[in-house]
């Protein structure tokens, strides 16, 4: 069952009401939650973001990210081929526009997993999109998760935590917030938001 969410000024059943944006601080568990949801719903379309950062071990181009050169990414910016984009720690990140709009045009739900500023860009451009903020139980728990990944130097972790504080201050601008304390509960919460159907309002309502 597809999800439908109504935003101010967006009619029920509007194609863009099928656009869900999942966001939250780095290390909060967005990837894990989304992977679990996709295992339960293999046909769910999740947009593949583009980036200029180098691939991490095990990442595959076209599956985890579209890995581009800076020149290629800047060409996409110039030709308006991105729904949103940002530069973080010297690397570009963004969402290719065409695949998302093609899916929405034929009535398929689409999920974006992007950073907080990108999510707010999408909401500004597409008010019918539903924003879901994944938050940690505490900053202390988030710090431990970042350290346990073993992919960042201590200085980089501190930068990520500083950014997390800024992003948490924006959480109230999202339509929904989910605390990733127990993974199973967080997955179920996101799944309910994805596949909950909201009926049309009565005429004149």
Curated annotation (Swiss-Prot):
PROSITE patterns: GUANYLATE_KINASE_1, GUANYLATE_KINASE_2. Pfam families: Guanylate_kin. InterPro entries: GK/Ca_channel_bsu, Guanylate_kin-like_dom, Guanylate_kinase, Guanylate_kinase_CS, P-loop_NTPase. GO terms for cellular component: cytosol. Residues 17-195 form the Guanylate kinase-like domain. SMART domains: GuKc. It comes from the Bacteria. Disulfide bonds: none annotated. It catalyses: GMP + ATP = GDP + ADP. Its EC number is 2.7.4.8. GO terms for molecular function: ATP binding; guanylate kinase activity. SUPFAM superfamilies: P-loop containing nucleoside triphosphate hydrolases. It is found in: Cytoplasm. ATP binds at residues 24-31. Essential for recycling GMP and indirectly, cGMP. Belongs to the guanylate kinase family. This is Guanylate kinase. The gene is gmk.
């Amino acid at each position: 069952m597809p999800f439908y969410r109504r935003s101010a000024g967006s009619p029920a059943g509007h194609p863009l009401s099928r656009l869900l944006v999942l966001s939250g601080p780095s290390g909060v568990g967005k990837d894990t939650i989304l992977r679990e949801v996709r295992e339960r719903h293999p046909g769910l379309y999740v947009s593949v973001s583009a980036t200029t950062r180098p691939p991490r071990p095990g990442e595959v181009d076209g599956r985890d990210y579209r890995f581009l050169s800076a020149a290629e990414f800047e060409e996409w910016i110039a030709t308006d081929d991105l729904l949103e984009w940002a530069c973080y720690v010297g690397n570009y990140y963004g969402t290719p526009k065409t695949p998302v709009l093609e899916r929405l045009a034929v009535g398929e739900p689409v999920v974006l997993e992007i950073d907080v500023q990108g999510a707010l860009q999408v909401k500004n451009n597409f008010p019918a999109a539903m924003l879901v903020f994944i938050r940690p139980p505490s900053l202390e728990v988030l710090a431990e998760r970042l350290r346990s990944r073993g992919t960042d130097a201590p200085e980089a972790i501190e930068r990520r935590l500083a950014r997390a504080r800024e992003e948490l201050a924006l959480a109230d601008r999202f339509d929904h917030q989910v605390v990733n304390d127990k993974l199973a509960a967080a997955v179920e919460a996101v799944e309910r938001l994805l596949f909950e159907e909201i009926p049309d309002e009565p005429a004149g309502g």
